[in-house]
Amino acid sequence: MKHLSKAAVLALGVLLATAPVAAASGTDRQAAAPAAVSQAANDPSDLNPEVTDGSNYTGDPTNEAALVASEDQRLIQVRTQASIARWTGSSLNVPYRVASGTGYTLVLTARTKDYTMDDLLSLAPKTFVRQPDGSYLLSENIVIESGATLTLGSSMLLTVKMFSSAQKFVSIVNYGGRLNVAGSATAPVKITSWDVDHSTPRQITDNGRAYIRSIGGTVSIEHASFESLGFWSGRTGGLSMTGSDRPITGAISAAGAALAKHHSKNSKFPEVEKDAAGEPVPGAVLPSDIIPALEGEATNSDFSYVTASVVNTEITDNVYGVFLANAVGVSIHNVTADRSRMDGFVLHRNVSNATIVDSTARHSAVDGFRLSRSIRSVRLDTDKAENNGRDGIYIDGRALATGPSATGTSISSHGNDVVVINSTMTGNAHYGLEIRGGRSTTVRSNTISDSLMGIVVQDAASGVTVDDNHLSNLATQAIALRDGVTGGKITNNTVSNSIVGVYLRDAAADVESNRFTNITNHGISALGAAEISVRSNIISGSGPSAVDLKRAPNATTSHNTTSEWTVTKPFWQMVVSFFQPLTILWTVLGLILVFTALRGRRLKRTIRHPYADQAPMSTFTDLDPLQVRPDSLGPAGPEASSDVSERPRGRRSADEDRGQPGTFRPAEGGHVEAAFS
């Protein structure tokens, strides 16, 4: 190390320090606008226009996104200092301070003893100050390094106010260490942003706002409250436990020690095979034992996945109530997230073995509970999602990619083995519970009411079980499976006061032993060619039909009870059902026949011979030119002309013509002769 140039040391430090932060930003793609995040989760055409998608976020998108990037750079700078010190052999066994951005960052280095409130007062007498009301104002950033523990707690009520103004804000970042917020039932801990200009929690996020984040390491929070924290992104959203998909810098120290020890035992490096001229043989490599195998290093606690426990805690007016990514073994119990400016509880990426129990999300601008892609083995038990701007609970188990991608992400479903049980979803503007993709999701013994729709499963989700739920007062459909769902089980549910009880569209499912009451259109309706079984359901209400399977050719039905169903068709539905193509055609033909018959009766007053108008031409002339002799026509000249002109015009009867000069009558034998007087 002594022979390394300063430039090389700096380059190594930057490289090592950059890895975890860059990875964190890669897994948490929240630097994009919240509206874009929401749009990826939900097709806008599927949203009620009155339902928010996060685009009504009240901050300054341009400035806040820049501040997120600035925070990433600040953390890189802090880690770079630690890396340089480590590589140059300098000792950083005591806390130190780094100038960065608009202020300073106090770095708590590794030690066996916890850092406490007293330590902060001693280390930062000018930036961690006790206020007249007994609270403490923190006006510089804190970073907890790997191997260090910060415990915030007291024997009495403890309030920590984190500086937030139009000029700057502060944060507490646990970088692979341990953060304890240790309150009790009688002495809780309260942490809030603090607008020093107005002496209130900071409401405006345009210029950023104080936040708490853990990158790897461990977080333990009990009997605490957090208010008005965070801005713009998930990792700066208030109370964030993100982890990273790469090891924290300090995690490689053990490996370095192992390498150094191995090298001391083997001071002479082996050489590669050479040819007769002393040149290395092409393809020759060093022996495999030059570097020791480092099995088990990935389990080092300094690695990126965060572990967290949050118990008996209230969170109010954060951008994100609780934000998790790259987390394992997370336990959230009796936590309330109220008035979050985006989502209440977010499990964003690579979260597994997590439980959220007895917790409540209410009045969130978007979703109450949001489980994004790439999660598995998550359980929501006895939770409440009330009056949220979009879905009560949203679960996205779709694949992260549909084909080859720059990151080589798997195309398999990621939202697997999620259980939602004994929970309540009420008053949410969009759906009570929405599931998109994923496998083996179980929804059991929940109560869902007063939403646009109750439970919606779509986007080729497989193996979804919807069992023993109570759904009521849904504006359209209580349970809907659609768009490629397979292996669905809808059993033992109770549905009341909905237009449609169960709706299936291109979804394969068994609908069995459900009870439907006060349904106003169809108890069960299906369309598409998927295999559907409908049996042993009890359906009551009124509408066109209790079970509508006319558009589902592969559906089977048996043992359904519909005796209390009243078949009714509203006027407009009758009109629509009447005006079918064939109905219109036959109606037009019938009208034509009726019109023709009536017109014929009006014109046909007397009985006439059918050929009355087809008389021979001879009946219309006085002379037959074929039978008249020239000498029988009488004298020619003016007299004859005058005689002819003076004759009365028109046809005369045969009796009048008989015996008149110049007239003819038929002779016997059919010949015509001239008759003269």
Describe every region a protein language model picked out.
Residues 603-677:
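Cytoplasmic C-terminal tails of single-pass
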Residues 24-357, 361-429, 476, 574-587, ...:
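Beta-strand/loop edge motif enriched in small/polar residues
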Residues 437:
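Acidic, aromatic-lined catalytic clefts of primarily extracellular/periplasmic carbohydrate-active enzymes
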Residues 1-26, 589:
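Secretory targeting and sorting signals
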Residues 22-23, 400, 440, 509:
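Short, glycine-/Ser/Thr-/acidic-enriched flexible segments
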Residues 445-451, 457-463, 467-576:
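Membrane-proximal extracellular "stem/stalk" segments
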Residues 555-556, 562-571, 580-601, 608-611, ...:
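C-terminal capping region of solenoid repeat domains
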Residues 321-323, 330-335, 343-346, 354-359, ...:
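Extended, compositionally simple hydrophobic/Ser/Thr-rich segments
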